[in-house]
């Protein structure tokens, strides 16, 4: 202080210089480094087929079940959850603030702030990423994040205005808001066909990949590899016994002999994408409880995994299937890792061609990619899927191993997240 006082007596120029030094050294954050963020529980519902076993439940109810299951698995009081983010794409007809409905339905305090995230198919993962950022910065210390979708309950709509002579045309919001490239006015499946052509990926390769996805999913269920991540869903039917759904529904509904014979859906001439080698319309929800490492110590909770890195990327809208190949290198660079350091890859199977394209572009080992199947065989509730693949990695990895999940989204985007099992 005597030195500063002496400097201040030497005139205005030195006084200004001292003020600049003080300003530069001033800190506006409680910690100079980011908090470490850990996953302490990771839960999902079974995935229901379109108009299938879970179709009587709205997305918000499925979200409540996943959130409640995750908090119970974490073994913490609900009051400890300071905020919640959930991904949800097809919100038409769900009512105000879907995440708020899901959170209050799970029994969390009325004071819990809630936000719904819509990044199309990457919504569930983006919710986890944004919650992680909140925790890293110290804005909160315990959060819930995930994704939910009930494609079975998405309504049809018609334009407002006078009814014209000849009637009105109803639009399916699944197609309009979830599966259409608004820039090129084409279905996501046509974008997938464009990718297949660009990278010379054949119908036969896609069919083989789809068969492998179904085979892997069946083997994983039979070996109990999904058991720790799935919470049963009880369906109450008036006048009948309750129905308990414990397993994914979609992977059982396949006839392998029909796959090579199916007609292409989006491009009749020289097309490659069929109903079998694309993902299906589905219902489900997934949630994780995230907290800072300090909060985990305070609550005496043993983490499953830590959030190591995450990133987004964007390309031309028609090339959305390729976008993960641009997000993944960002994640690896941020984490200081190489591809060889990754034990398991999850690349969301929106279409078989998506995974095949990213394996080719990133030169990944196919034996490490979606080793327990993916959306082609398990199903693709679009707001849930990004969270589901993170949930699966949190359980499937062994201690010390790294897993990298990536998912493309309509509009030319992708999100990717790296976790390390603890």
Curated annotation (Swiss-Prot):
Name of the protein this chain belongs to: Acetyl-CoA acetyltransferase, mitochondrial
CDD domains: thiolase
Keywords tagged on the record: Acetylation, Acyltransferase, Fatty acid metabolism, Lipid metabolism, Metal-binding, Mitochondrion, Potassium, Transferase, Transit peptide
UniProt keyword annotation of Transit peptide present: yes
Residues flagged as site, Increases nucleophilicity of active site Cys: 380
Feature: transit peptide: 1-28
GO cellular component annotations of the record: mitochondrion
Subunit structure: Homotetramer.
The record's account of how the chain is modified after translation: Succinylation at Lys-263, adjacent to a coenzyme A binding site. Desuccinylated by SIRT5.
Residues recorded as bearing N6-succinyllysine in the entry: 61, 73, 169, 176, 185, 197, 218, 238, 240, 258, 261, 263
């Amino acid at each position: 202080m005597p030195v500063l006082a002496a400097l201040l007596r030497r005139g205005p120029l030195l006084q200004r210089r001292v003020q600049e030094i003080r300003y530069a050294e001033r800190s506006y954050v409680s910690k100079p480094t980011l908090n470490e963020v850990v996953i302490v529980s990771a839960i999902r519902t079974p995935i229901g087929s379109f108009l299938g076993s879970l179709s009587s439940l709205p997305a918000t109810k499925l979200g409540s079940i996943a959130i409640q299951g995750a908090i119970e698995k974490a073994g913490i009081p609900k009051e400890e959850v300071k905020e919640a983010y959930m991904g949800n794409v097809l919100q038409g007809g769900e009512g105000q603030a879907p995440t708020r409905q899901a959170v209050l339905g799970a029994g969390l305090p009325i004071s819990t702030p809630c936000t719904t995230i819509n990044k199309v198919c990457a919504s569930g993962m983006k919710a986890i990423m944004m919650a992680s950022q909140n925790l890293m910065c110290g804005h909160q210390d315990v959060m819930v994040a995930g994704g939910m979708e009930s494609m079975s309950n998405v309504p049809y709509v018609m334009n407002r205005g006078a009814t014209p002579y000849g009637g009105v045309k109803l639009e399916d919001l699944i197609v309009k808001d979830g599966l259409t490239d608004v820039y090129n006015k084409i279905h996501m499946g046509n974008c997938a066909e464009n990718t297949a052509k660009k990278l010379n990926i054949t119908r036969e390769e896609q069919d083989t990949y789809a068969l492998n996805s179904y085979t892997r999913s069946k083997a994983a269920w039979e070996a109990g590899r999904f058991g720790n991540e799935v919470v049963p869903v009880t369906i109450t039917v008036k006048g009948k016994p309750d129905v308990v759904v414990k397993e994914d529904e979609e992977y059982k509904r396949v006839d392998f002999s029909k796959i090579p014979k199916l007609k292409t859906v989006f491009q009749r001439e020289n097309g490659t994408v069929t109903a079998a080698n694309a993902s299906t319309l589905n219902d489900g929800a997934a949630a994780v409880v995230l907290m800072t490492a300090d909060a985990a110590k305070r609550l005496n909770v043993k983490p499953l995994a830590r959030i190591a890195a995450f990133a987004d990327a964007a390309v031309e809208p028609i090339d959305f299937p390729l976008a993960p190949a641009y997000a993944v290198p960002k994640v690896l660079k941020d984490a200081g890792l190489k591809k060889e350091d990754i034990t398991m890859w999850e690349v969301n199977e929106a279409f078989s061609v998506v995974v095949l394209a990213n394996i080719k572009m990133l030169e990944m080992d196919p034996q490490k990619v979606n080793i327990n199947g993916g959306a082609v065989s398990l199903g693709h509730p679009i707001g849930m899927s990004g969270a589901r693949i993170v949930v699966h990695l949190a359980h499937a990895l062994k201690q010390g191993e790294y897993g990298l999940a990536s998912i493309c989204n309509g509009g030319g985007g992708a999100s990717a997240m790296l976790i390390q099992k603890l």
